[in-house]
Regions:
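Membrane-spanning alpha-helical segments of multipass transporters and channels
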Residues: 81-82, 90-215
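Transmembrane helix-boundary elements of multi-pass transport/secretion proteins
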Residues: 1-76, 83-86, 93-94, 179, ...
Length: 215
């Protein structure tokens, strides 16, 4: 009913594009973030990387990932302009809230990638973690099957996926046209994802310094 009332043409691409495009972008961010850090460990260049950053893991991560952030955010701006400006998909609260949500998704996804490679500091395991988490996001975020109809455990687990919160912001902002204040729990959730690297950053630094990659 929500889809029909906010998509009177019953255009299926409105559903597909607004869910698959940000989901694929999120999956790419997971994979590229893990790969860019994991290759430093695999190629035994991690110590040199840290040395160039004055042995600061924070400077090292910022220097490596900020260019990615800019590129991914530009990609996000382009797909928002294309969907809402060119194709005229429903966007009842304007395009700016969706661009802000996209920036939050990009940052949250990058931080999740740091957590993935920090938890499993090998390239193959980190990429496996990233691909698995990213693919599951499509199923558990409420795109194809409503979360409220899932098992209560799965309903709770759905909150562990950034894409779920982006989807809820999309429903509130683009489809329903609510004020951004109504989506504050989802923005806060994405902010929490951005804070998660602080839990693994010291473990990641130890892996960069001491871990020996075994093919």
């Amino acid at each position: 009913m929500l889809f029909r009332s906010n998509n009177p043409w019953l255009n299926y691409s409105v559903y597909l594009c607004n869910t698959l495009v940000p989901g694929v972008l999120m999956l790419m961010i997971f994979m590229i973030t893990v790969y860019s850090i994991g290759t430093e460990i695999k190629d035994r260049t991690a110590r040199e990387w840290l040395r160039m950053s004055n042995n600061s893991i924070y400077i090292a991560l910022a220097g490596k990932l900020l260019p990615h952030t800019v590129i991914f955010f530009i990609m996000g701006i382009f797909y928002n302009i294309y969907l809402y400006g060119f194709l005229h998909f429903p966007c009842n609260s304007g395009i700016l809230p969706m661009i802000l949500a996209t920036l939050c998704l990009v940052l949250a996804s990058q931080c999740c990638g740091i957590v993935m490679i920090g938890t499993l500091p090998t390239l193959r395991l980190g990429l496996s973690f990233a691909s698995l988490w990213g693919v599951i996001s499509f199923s558990i975020s409420g795109f194809s099957f409503p979360v409220m109809a899932m098992h209560p455990v799965l309903q709770a687990l759905s909150n562990l996926f950034p894409l779920r919160h982006y989807f809820l912001i999309y429903v509130d902002q683009a489809l329903n046209g609510y004020s951004m204040i109504y989506s504050w729990p989802n923005y806060m959730a994405l902010l929490i994802f951005m804070m998660l690297p602080f839990l693994v950053v010291h473990r990641l630094k130890e892996a960069l310094v001491y871990y020996k990659y075994i093919p």
